[in-house]
Amino acid sequence: MGRLRVVSKQLRGYTAIEVELRKAVLGAKMNKVETYQKAWSLVLKGDFALVDQIYHPEYRSFDLRTGIYTNIDDDKVIVTTENEEIFTSYPEVIYENDDFLCIIAYQKVADPEPRFRSFITAINYKDGQILNQKTTVQELDFDPSEHLDWNWEDYE
């Protein structure tokens, strides 16, 4: 099963417990990107409850890797059967409004030699739930952490 590690410069210096405590004390509600990231992190641990809550019953997406339309159950299988060890950065919001979210994140894939990729995901919402999404993946010939404000080693 694939592994997901989250890189977040916003939360650097805080333990997971401190982050949750801050949210509880401040009454902070997770925003769209936090909810999306948390949902898929939980899927990798076998917990599908949050994904089931945030996806619309009519959800459908075209998976560019397989060339088929998928529903949320298909997406769960695809994510949980990933054989590679993958570390994923915390998503950065490109654009967001009530009905749309566009994010970019980076991955380090642990092959014999590490390789890197970026992915941009565009998400449409209906009634506050994810109706569809499209993700495009770009293989990179450089380590994105060398050019951004974080590094993989802090989170591996």
Task: Locate predicted features.
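A solvent-exposed, acidic/Ser-Thr-rich amphipathic alpha-helical stretch
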Residues: 34, 48-99
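Short, low-complexity N-terminal intrinsically disordered segments enriched in polar/charged residues
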Residues: 11-53, 57, 150-156
